[in-house]
């Protein structure tokens, strides 16, 4: 990854926004900008240089991973020393991201600088400059994300023979997660969702000791982390033979998902993509059971900008990677969700999770 190039791009955005210096504390942003992946870090971007502050646990790791920034090992607080260094450099102000800064953090930041500099020294941004950069992936990021997405598809296909009536949801999740590790994944993008029978009506129904019923839908929502990037996909399968009503519900969700994928075109808003899915479910009389947004960005983190939701005005541009995941949830009965990762190209959306979306009856 070309971290020096990312820092140069960020500096141009800072200059355009009139920002003299920036304090980055969100760990995913730190990793994006300089490569360091430790659990304690503050990146100070000031006049002409970027400085990474961490603690003694990461002395070796920081040297190995960091590029584009000078590494400093803090004796006490990395955040405090990062702020002190910016104050000592003579900058007039420091901008921070309030979405990743707690009240306790702010107290540490203020205590780090002389009292005569505190007034107006720290300013919060209304938007995250780094999040805006992370929305559009470069060529190397896209390669890594497609590798992660394709691994997820292979894992799903290998898992299908192990899904059966009487098998515990946790067993299915364990099989999936073990296979992910065996195939090179660094971990899972989030807690694996295996929700069967009436539990499928829980949008975030994490795997439990519940046994898969003799008949009904099973929602499988999972992702892997590969080479530092997340994948995310959902497929819904059926145990037994689906009834006409169940098949109609499944086909409606699949049609809604495809309509949203087809709506992914550079220049449209993410809100328009959301509406494409909802309109199909509205015509099918099922829109009231679609209770969440249609999707989100993916990258270093499982949930990134942009949001794909009603009334969102973010314009889609080439290089964005989003999920398209409409679902319906009928309490006490069943749930269905189908999700793909989609890359926005120069002309359309390209699905990078090509596993079958036909109704699979096991």
Give names to the regions the model predicted.
Residues 1-362:
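Active-site neighborhoods and metal-handling regions in enzymes and metal-associated proteins
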